[in-house]
């Protein structure tokens, strides 16, 4: 479940294991129209009102931020997602760098991880520049 800073449910992220990596399906509503940074953060904790408790982008491999930079991207770098004029996000994102558990970049490691939607778009450069965190969801096993 994705929640905003008021604790309201604004969407969900579902993760499916693929032959190589994962498929990430994100749906959300109540998001300002436009492009938004979407990242996997290093700690499965959305308790802080600004979601800083989720830590930095997930980078277990030590790579730098930015799809368009050298020695990058790190595992938590994901493509921007778009909210339409009604504030709805519906996106499928793939990552060959991430795994659910095991291998080099497991989302379900000891301290977990969290998906974050940011207020603005990621620059894909050395600094994300995506602004404040507006929605957060801890990665959990499906029940």
What are these regions (language model features)?
Residues 1-143:
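N-terminal leader/targeting pre-sequences
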């Amino acid at each position: 479940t994705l929640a905003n800073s008021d604790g309201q449910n604004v969407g969900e992220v579902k993760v499916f294991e693929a032959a190589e990596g994962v498929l990430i399906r994100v749906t959300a509503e109540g998001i300002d129209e436009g492009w938004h940074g979407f990242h996997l953060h290093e700690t499965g904790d959305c308790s802080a009102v600004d979601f800083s408790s989720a830590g930095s982008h997930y980078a277990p491999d030590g790579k730098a931020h930015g799809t368009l930079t050298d020695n990058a991207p790190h595992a938590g770098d994901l493509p921007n997602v778009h909210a339409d004029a009604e504030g709805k996000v519906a996106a499928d994102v793939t990552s060959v760098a991430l795994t659910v558990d095991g291998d080099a970049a497991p989302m379900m490691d000891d301290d977990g991880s969290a998906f974050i939607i940011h207020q603005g778009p990621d620059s894909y450069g050395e600094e994300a520049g995506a602004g404040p965190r507006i929605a957060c969801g801890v990665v959990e096993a499906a029940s």
